[in-house]
Amino acid sequence: MSDLFSIVRKNDNPSGRIIWSEDQIAFIINEYNNHHSTTKIANKFNVSRESIRNVLRKNNCKVLSLEELGKINYPRNSDYFQEINSPDKAYWLGFLYADGYIGKTGEIRINLADKDEDHLRKFLAAIDASHSSIKHSVKKIDKKIFNQSYISIRDKKLVKDLADKGCVNNKSLILTFPTDKVPCHLYSHFIRGYFDGDGSINFFKPTKARKPNYRISFYGTEDMLKHIRAILNKDNLALEKRNNIYSLTIMGNKQLESILSFIYKDSYDEIELTRKRQIYTNFLLQRIGGEPTQVGCE
């Protein structure tokens, strides 16, 4: 395979014209037809992107501009969110409610930390778009560097159906709980998706305590959190408001056991964030006995 990527130039001149072998040309065409970018192919040969584009043009391949690439519709299940009638659809709707960017031009974008990149693959698999590429970027906040993974998909049908379910552009201050869009028996999956996207679970150990105490928090609009609070049977807890964002925090290992058992009810790997699931598993390992009380809808 190493010989495949070895470049031969005319007269062995480092700046001379590249003499491509038939195998190299076939490889380039095959990679491009399988939706690999010209930049990615060029990096394999250590040549410029334009060199790859020239090979494609000379072999009658249509080379798309960056604008055209952004608009291309690769095969996917565009009807995925048409009806929320399964655990996976409820989960991903909740996740996009919390952590998805929905553009006016038909774009869905999800940004996650690099450590959660596998979660993007789970979403792509859910909508039958595993061929779509995951991109990477670096974000700087308060002099701290964050490495991110993200996907960007353009699909007007997906975006329209999401909008019909209340997941809209600039949603952070106007989201309402989709009581008429998500069946009651799927609430746990929707809330888990929302929790994975815009919630936290962590622990702290008081000085005299033998075991760590856990707490979970949800963040969002007042309407969203009031509905989540009611479903979790925690109407006695107050919401906190800071910079137009509300939060709901629940502490105490005993009550968290019942809440987390509801959130993770009938969950499985494809519809849960692995990192948070591991924290929940550690929490269960530290609990001793006791049956969790019932929360959620009957």
List PLM regions with ranges.
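Internal intein/HINT superfamily modules and their associated LAGLIDADG
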Residues: 2-298
